[in-house]
Amino acid sequence: MTIPHEVLAQGWIPFTVVVVLAILFSWFYIRYYQDHSQSEVSSTITGIIALFIALMTTALVPVDIFLVSYMKNDDGSWKPWSANRMNRDDIEETAVATTYYILYALLAFFVFVIIPFMYFFFEERDEDITTAERACGALKYSIGFLIVASVLLLVGAFAPLKQPPKNVTEWDKRLIFLKDELKSNNGETALSLLIGFLTLIGMLIMITYTAYGMTALPFSLLKGFKSAKTEQESVTRRRSRNQEQARLIKAQYMGGRAMSSRDRRRLSELEKEEHALATRERRLEAAQLGWLNKCLKLLRPFEMVFGAFFLLVALLIFVSLFITCLDKALHSNGYQYGYSLPTPQLPNPINIIMVYAQIVFPLDYCLFLLVVLYFVYSSMAGIRRVGIRCCWIKLFKVRPRRTLPQALLFMCVMLMLIVLSLNVMLFSLAPQYVMYGSQNYRANSTVTSLVNHTGIIQNVTTSHGIAKVCSMEMSSDHCTMTRIAVFLNRFFYKVWFFGACYYWGTWLFLVVFMTGLIYSIVRKRKTVVDEEYDSSDDSDEEMVTA
């Protein structure tokens, strides 16, 4: 039986809408942050396409979940069109899996080839150098990234990874779900290792930026800005004190006596501080008269509402991740299997919400996208506050309409890796939903009763099917796992090191989240010009060459 058209329409039409929204979102984000005075069309287009591809890898996940959920009825029976195993494979192993492969391959191509080339291509810009010479120079520096990608692909293709048992009787009951899913070619294993390496880097970026941004974002909205008028009065008083100190120092040397080195140094410090305070005072005066300050006053109630909402979402995510990590610590298969969780035992709030939301299509799709956008927005909040750093050395600043093309490409790579690692994070955030959606299976139940008709007691046994929630303990004949879950579980089985790193990385993410929460609570409020005042410090070029 062929797949009904309404199934394909309900699964792929929302995905098409998301594709359009992702293009608009990527274009707006890149254009909002780039410095228009120094931008190049090539770097702008590269950033937009790169961010779009990263968003697509995550946007495909709810389509994957919808298709496997729609294969079954609520009572756990297969629908007529999905009762045939070949039809199910045509959807999951052909259409969905191929789309995943294409998107992941494009993402790796951009990370290792296109973006490094465009970065060095911009660095080679000079009036005396032709475009061909710039391209040759950029290609020379980009070869190193291509070598790293090639090595990872070769290792993934030919390294002796963990193999499944040859004898069916040797299969552990906990791994029965993988019995039919471990058949993969060398090409898929090579791509998995390459993506796993990128995902691991993305996890480190999430721990550094996203965990902090999830607390910094809501508290910045809840606290708001200091009063520009009050801050200006404080700056004016500081200027008066500094001017008085400078006058007293100069008065000591009115007779032409040589100024001591101590007083000369102190006077120089006062003059520098006077210049900075004068600049700040002018900006505070302009802020009081500007339309932005007036709009912020009008929007203040909405800021507090959104701040409270974002804080609740952050706490809900924290609780869900903590419960899943605790569940894995108690009931997982251990580090040798990447801490895979056969059946979630502890109630996970986000998992419960997403499973029940799938009843009203496409409510779960909308909630899923909101969670993804919240992670992206929180990541950007962390990147803006921390800056782009390497080994704690600040390389670039990310500022609206003032971000250099090099920083923009760096930011795109960071967001791509964050979104890529978000697929693994979502697997911990809502494990049941990401693996099986709302699928049930029919479990045979035997009921024995005692019947007495003629004074003789007889045992009467009846059997019927009971709908139970799908779990890893069931084979693919009873439940169909999403492709994203198959990829992750298969990869964790073959290379347990990555699964263990993701598990302990999630714990570290929670620790950084709590640290950022405490810091955001005790941190003082900023003024409306603090971001602009910070942008007047050393330029990005000076930071890189320092």
From Swiss-Prot:
Gene source species: Nematostella vectensis (Starlet sea anemone)
Cellular component, GO annotation: lysosomal membrane; vacuolar membrane
Family, per entry: Belongs to the LIMR family. LMBRD1 subfamily.
Localisation: Lysosome membrane
Gene Ontology MF terms in the entry: cobalamin binding
TM region positions: 8-28, 48-68, 102-122, 141-161, 189-209, 304-324, 352-372, 407-427, 495-515
Keywords, alphabetical: Cobalamin, Cobalt, Glycoprotein, Lysosome, Membrane, Transmembrane, Transmembrane helix, Transport
Described purpose of this protein according to its UniProt entry: Probable lysosomal cobalamin transporter. Required to export cobalamin from lysosomes allowing its conversion to cofactors.
Major localization class: membrane
Membrane topology according to the record: Multi-pass membrane protein
Name this protein carries in UniProt: Probable lysosomal cobalamin transporter
Residues that carry a glycan: N167, N444, N452, N459
The keyword Membrane is assigned to this record: yes
GO biological process: protein localization to vacuole
Alphabetical list of InterPro entries matching this protein: LMBD1_LysCbl_Transport, LMBR1-like_membr_prot
Organism classification: Eukaryota, Metazoa, Cnidaria, Anthozoa, Hexacorallia
